[in-house]
Amino acid sequence: HAKLIVSLDCGIRSVEMVQLAQSFGIDFIICDHHRPGEELPPAVAILDPKQKNCPYPYKELSGCGVGFKLLQALCMRAGYSSDVLFEEIDLLAISICSDIVPITGENRVFTYYGIQKLNQAPRPGIQAIIDVSGLKKAIDVNSIVFTIGPRINAAGRIDHAFAAVDLLLASNKLDAANFAGTINDHNLVRREFDETITGEALTMIQNSVHVDTACSTVLYKNDWHKGVIGIVASRCIEHYHRPTIILTKSNGKVAGSARSVPDYDLYEAIDKCSDLLIQFGGHKYAAGLTMEEKNIDAFRIKFEEVVSASIRKEQLIPMISIDLDLPLNQISTQFYNIVRQMGPFGPQNMQPIFVSRNVYDDGTARILKDKHLKLNIRQEDSVTYSAIGWQMHSFFDRIHKKEPFDICYTLEENEFNGKKSIQLLIRDIQFVKDRNPQI
């Protein structure tokens, strides 16, 4: 008996679906932030800052951010206080961080106040996720992106998103803990799928005859789990830095998830291959697509042609942009607090990356869990700083032999046994012997 459907984070290209709803006398309001196609759906209202001639000044709202704006306008029109709406700003912050949209403008303001609420008065469902995940430190953008967001998303990836809705709506600790336990189990399954499929995908790339020359990656396996192929695409880019599309069988068709490298417009590239697709949608750095199985090879060839003709060579090389050459003796609590004021950090407002040169370990270097690097580093005239590098165990032998090296890193606050200290989060290491003399 529904008379109105409101879409959130989708619908901008769903022309036929909205037409079908119309035929049943159902109105549609679309809240989306993806790029529209040439034809807009015949909805009674379309809220999308990326549609042509949209006067709204800020174009980078998340999908939930657009929905938040609809509710904000509704409060204004109906004379309701917006205080009730802003009670949900913690959920808006989670959406902004999880959607990987720029942390600029309104997004930065919403994220700042949303994170404040997450830390000061988390709702039962969020507190339950914090508890079940073992998260100890204050919540920030990274906590949302890597701990809270993936668990909420895991419900829909592995089973059904209703489980996440139940969690976020839970009004007491007991219900929240039960829902969080279920969602955490889904996340463990998601991780297993992620690791297995990523391993298979990387092996396929390694065995490809074009592994060293290709400008793109398009992989297909009919039994890959659709819920993790976007994550797998991102993992592949970490190893092979080029636009990547992972495809799998879904409902008799082939569905895909695409991810890009910095500054390359993936959406435009896919659009040029749209004659081989049933449908697609997304934005510059991420997209989804559907095609017939018979078109996979033709799509792979055409997509590679499009990318190789439009991507710059430097975009295929992972780069780390250094913000400041920083001697270790200039790092202090005061300096860290000044840096922290620039947050919340995220896309287009990334945490400053520093480089300190000619450093060495104090002899306590060790490997954690067979893959992570834990150091205590110093320069000749500095105190010693704790540093950690995820997945950087390959540097251990040379560091252990006291070879001096340059290190680029971000700063973070580490808490152990109730004591807070500044820790260096390593982004990359270059040994002094390996320096390029031209740099």
PLM region descriptions:
Residues 1-4, 9, 24-25, 75-298, ...:
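Hydrophobic helix-and-loop "lid/oligomerization" segment in the mid-to-C-terminal part
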Residues 3, 44, 406:
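Conserved acidic residues
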Residues 10-11, 33-36, 45, 50-52, ...:
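Short, ordered loop/turn segments at secondary-structure junctions
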Residues 14-15, 99:
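Intrinsically disordered, low-complexity regulatory tails of plant transcription factors
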Residues 15-24, 33-34, 41, 230-233:
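Short Gly/Thr/Asp-enriched flexible loops that form oxyanion-binding sites at enzyme active sites
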Residues 38-48, 377-383:
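Acidic-glycine-rich active-site phosphate/pyrophosphate-binding loop
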Residues 41-80, 85-97:
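Short alpha-helices
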Residues 175-179, 185-219, 272-439:
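Mid-to-C-terminal polyanion-binding domains and interfaces
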